[in-house]
Amino acid sequence: MTEQPGRPKYYRGAVAISGDRIALVSDSPQRIERYERERGEGLQVADGAGRLVMPGLINLHNHVSMTLMRGYADDLPLMPWLTEKIWPFEAKLDGDDIYSGAELGIAEMLLGGTTAFVDMYWYADRVAEAAIRSGIRAVVSPAFVGTAFDGYVERTQRMIERYNGAAGDRIRVWVAPHAPYTCTPEQIRESLKLCERNGVGVNIHVAETLSEVETIRERYGKTPVEHLRDLGVFDYRALAVHCVHLTETDMEILSRQGVSVVYNPQSNMKLASGIAPVA
């Protein structure tokens, strides 16, 4: 089954794979038989009768290594969850822990039909290594908060040079300021120089909770979306994650600037953040 506009939808047929590429998609018995003859005895055939072949799913927002924290720190709103539980937990993790958590989370995604994901986390190079080993496609985004910005630009530049386009272009590297309430305007602007220099995108949490919206209004006299627009975040390919609490003006800004909004209903319910205004 294909769902792309202008492409045919095959309801009965075959998919042929050569190496790591799709070599044939057809519902023509003649084309399928010809392909089988050309490949000869080396062709392996899997009977997919009663099954569905479709494009892989894409998970647009992850902290994949947090799979290690499943079942931990339930029944808390976002800020107590972060400050009292998650950040202290993360402070005890090292790169090997992040790699192990990424391997587990990636394996679970692949089992569920997800073949590509976007990640934002610490030790992003280890997430990239786990993605390369697994065969999945990934956009890995080294994250920063304001208290841990020293050296970020230099480290991320090195990571872009090493991993952006790696593994046959399966891996991309983007920039990830954590959120407008945890990063200063100066830090966000500085991180955006990486986007300008390398042609990469930016991945950031936006308007996740009412308290965030109130904090940004108090600090800057704007909504989080207006604040990030004025900093130039949306001048690059941008993923705005959550966007639970938006004004009509916010929505117009995001639409006009071509920002991709990523809705996270399970996260927003778990942390009592609210319900995004999805039409």
Language model features with spans:
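Metal-coordinating catalytic core of metallo-dependent amide/deamination hydrolases
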Residues: R126-V244
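Small-aliphatic-rich amphipathic alpha-helix that forms the alpha element of a beta-alpha
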Residues: S100-V118
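Active-site gating loops and adjacent loop-to-helix segments of metal-dependent hydrolytic enzymes
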Residues: L68-S100, A107, S134-P142, L210-R237, ...
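Divalent metal-coordination and catalytic microenvironments
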Residues: V15, D20, G50, H61, ...
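Histidine-rich, glycine-flanked metal-binding segment
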Residues: T2-M54
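A structural motif
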Residues: G112-T114, I136, G199, V259
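Active-site-adjacent C-terminal substructures of enzyme catalytic domains
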Residues: V233-A279
